[in-house]
Design a protein with these regions (language model features):
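Interdomain boundary/hinge segments at the C-termini of tandem beta-sandwich modules
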Residues: 44-52, 149-158, 250-258
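Beta-sheet-dominated interaction scaffolds and their linkers
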Residues: 51-80, 158-187, 260
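A short beta-strand micro-motif common to beta-rich folds, especially ectodomain repeats
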Residues: 23-35, 129-141, 232-243
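Extracellular and select intracellular beta-sandwich modules with Ser/Thr-enriched
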Residues: 38-43, 144-149, 244-250
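Residues on the solvent-exposed faces and adjacent turns
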Residues: 18, 33, 46, 61, ...
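Short, surface-exposed loop/turn segments at beta-strand-coil junctions that are enriched for proline
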Residues: 17-23, 122-128, 226-231
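Surface-exposed binding patches on compact interaction domains or structured appendages
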Residues: 1-14, 56-59, 63, 76, ...
Length: 260
């Protein structure tokens, strides 16, 4: 008798099933002599099982990468505890609650909903340095384990928008010759993460004049037309910025001379 014990009278064998508890089990075996009816009682004992628990924590992502312009990222955590009986799994794993902590400039833990952690990053306006941080998720209770998810955000994206215009786009000269100033606007606008940063700044440019009777003046924004004694004539002034790829063409025309 006794939980977990059984016998085979024919061969005087007593068996014990695995003890599912962490306590010793006891029982008795009674042997009865068929002819005399005499009995003998044997005490039985079974050692307590070794019960342990193994914690496991994993994440569906090891790194969260954010845009420089800010944003949210979600990571899903799997956190379990497995009961082991004498070194073997016993039953199914159970869920273990977790807590999270975020470190790193610009990063914060926005929400935790069950196994899902949402991390936020503010805009990084630093033009030379990216940002890094961590999300450390730790199990609650005994045997707790932790997992670290790396956080990464690049440096700000810096770009320039170039503008080059002339008003008017066609300049006319009298036949007797004259010098005219070109009305040119040459600027660049800095953008950080796609947004304007500061005011536009001037960009140098060069002017190339072509056409009979036309030449560049003493500055990049002046054109000289010589005296024209013949038929009307045309030329052009090609203006190129010293940065970027912008260029414009200004048409030049001069009236015919009186002798034409």
């Amino acid at each position: 008798s006794g939980t977990g014990f059984s016998g085979n009278a024919e061969i005087s064998q007593i068996s014990a099933t695995e003890n599912p508890t962490d306590k010793q089990r006891t029982g008795t075996a009674t042997i009865i002599q068929n002819e005399s009816g005499k009995t003998a009682t044997i005490s039985l004992s079974q050692a307590a099982s070794v019960i342990t628990y193994e914690n496991t924590i994993t994440a569906n992502k090891t790194t969260l990468t954010f845009a420089a312009t800010a944003g949210d990222q979600v990571v899903t955590i799997t956190s379990t505890r497995q009961k082991k009986l004498n070194g073997k799994n016993s039953g199914s794993p159970t869920t273990v609650n977790t807590t999270g902590k975020v470190t790193g400039t610009g990063f914060s833990l926005k929400t935790q909903s069950g196994a899902n952690y949402t991390v936020s990053a503010t805009e990084n306006t630093n033009e030379t340095t990216g940002r890094t941080g961590t999300l450390v998720v730790t199990q609650e209770g005994s045997g707790a384990k932790s997992i670290t998810i790396n956080l990464s955000q690049p440096k700000a994206t810096v770009a320039y928008t170039y503008n080059l215009t002339s008003n008017p786009s066609r300049v006319e000269f009298v036949a007797t010759g004259e010098t005219k100033t070109l009305s040119i606007s040459s600027t660049k606008q800095k953008t950080v993460n796609g947004k304007n940063s500061g005011s536009p700044v001037a960009v140098n440019y060069t002017t190339t004049v072509s056409g009979t009777g036309f030449s560049k003046g003493t500055t990049e924004y002046s054109v000289v037309a010589a005296v024209n004694t013949g038929t009307a004539r045309e030329g052009s002034a090609v203006v190129k910025q010293s940065e970027g790829t912008k260029q414009i063409t200004i048409m030049l025309s001069q009236a015919a001379g009186t002798s034409a």
